[in-house]
Curated annotation (Swiss-Prot):
Function text: Allows the formation of correctly charged Asn-tRNA(Asn) or Gln-tRNA(Gln) through the transamidation of misacylated Asp-tRNA(Asn) or Glu-tRNA(Gln) in organisms which lack either or both of asparaginyl-tRNA or glutaminyl-tRNA synthetases. The reaction takes place in the presence of glutamine and ATP through an activated phospho-Asp-tRNA(Asn) or phospho-Glu-tRNA(Gln).
A Gene Ontology molecular function term of the record: glutaminyl-tRNA synthase (glutamine-hydrolyzing) activity
Record gene name: gatC
One Pfam family, short name: GatC
Gene3D superfamilies hit by this protein: Glu-tRNAGln amidotransferase C subunit, N-terminal domain
EC number assigned by the record: 6.3.5.-
Lineage, highest ranks first: Bacteria, Pseudomonadati, Pseudomonadota, Betaproteobacteria, Burkholderiales
Family: Belongs to the GatC family.
Name by which UniProt lists this protein: Aspartyl/glutamyl-tRNA(Asn/Gln) amidotransferase subunit C
Keywords in alphabetical order: ATP-binding, Ligase, Nucleotide-binding, Protein biosynthesis
Length: 99
């Protein structure tokens, strides 16, 4: 995937950014470099490769200090929402700020 100068101008316009032509060219170069790197990584065959929890796990002698993913606090939803001005189905309701 390669972006064009027009793509950068369009995204800058949507983001309400004013870029000089040299900034647009620099951004185009950086983003295309990023996409090229992503394409290289996607091309690597990872079939049969076991995912690692942490790169240090490869070393073997390093003990990982990763804790179990267990909730350490009780669900406080009702208590947190007790003082809210508006709640619906467990969610805070806020005024619409974007038209």
């Amino acid at each position: 995937m390669a972006l064009t100068f027009k793509d950068i101008e369009r995204v800058a316009n949507l983001a309400r950014l004013e870029l000089r032509p040299d900034e647009t060219e620099h951004t185009l170069s950086q983003l295309n470099g990023f996409f090229a790197l992503v394409e290289q990584m996607q091309a690597v065959n990872t079939d049969g490769v076991e995912p690692l929890a942490h790169p240090a796990a490869l070393l073997g002698e390093v003990a990982l200090r990763l804790r179990e993913d267990i909730a350490s606090e009780p669900n406080q939803r009702e208590a947190s929402q007790a003082s809210a001005p508006a709640v619906e189905r467990g969610l805070f309701l806020v005024p619409k700020v974007i038209e």
